[in-house]
């Protein structure tokens, strides 16, 4: 019994496979989806999507978008996505420190918004790398 999951970014199809379970980073918190889930349309936040195939969890970083769940099919349209296998934890931690410093030094709303987005991406990269390491 599986779910069909498709993650589509503007430039490519990020994921197109079947899985037993998916946990989405929605704008209202984490949403777990199993076979037979009721129809759902939700906004996707910057964060880590976790996909369970058999007993293994695969993390994918989503950079905002929308998800539709219907008839055991999950279609996720995202602004962007990153594969975790390409993330170096040391660089991610350095980026988190840099993003935190830039946010603390931001002087106007535009800079604060941009710095906040960069901080959230950096946190998601670290979280995804940790999921993969466990």
Curated annotation (Swiss-Prot):
GO terms for molecular function: ATP binding; proton-transporting ATP synthase activity, rotational mechanism. One of its GO terms (cellular component) is chloroplast thylakoid membrane. It is found in: Plastid, Chloroplast thylakoid membrane. The keyword Kinase does not apply. Keywords: ATP synthesis, CF(1), Chloroplast, Hydrogen ion transport, Ion transport, Membrane, Plastid, Thylakoid, Transport. It is a peripheral membrane protein. Pfam families: ATP-synt_DE, ATP-synt_DE_N. It comes from the Eukaryota. NCBIfam families: ATP_synt_epsi (TIGR01216). Belongs to the ATPase epsilon chain family. Produces ATP from ADP in the presence of a proton gradient across the membrane. F-type ATPases have 2 components, CF(1) - the catalytic core - and CF(0) - the membrane proton channel. CF(1) has five subunits: alpha(3), beta(3), gamma(1), delta(1), epsilon(1). CF(0) has three main subunits: a, b and c. This is ATP synthase epsilon chain, chloroplastic. It comes from Gracilaria tenuistipitata var. liui.
């Amino acid at each position: 019994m599986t779910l069909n999951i498709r993650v589509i970014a503007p430039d490519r199809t990020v994921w197109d496979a079947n899985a037993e379970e998916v946990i989405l980073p929605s704008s209202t918190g984490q949403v777990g989806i199993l076979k037979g889930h009721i129809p759902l349309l939700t906004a996707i936040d910057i964060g880590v999507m976790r996909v369970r195939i058999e007993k293994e969890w695969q993390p994918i970083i989503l950079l905002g978008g929308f998800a539709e769940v219907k008839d055991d099919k999950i279609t996720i349209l995202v602004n962007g996505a990153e594969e975790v296998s390409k993330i170096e934890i040391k660089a991610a931690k350095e980026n988190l420190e840099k993003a935190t410093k830039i946010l603390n030094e931001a002087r106007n709303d535009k800079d604060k918004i941009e710095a906040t987005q960069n901080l959230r991406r950096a946190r998601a990269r670290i979280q995804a790398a940790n999921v993969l390491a466990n």
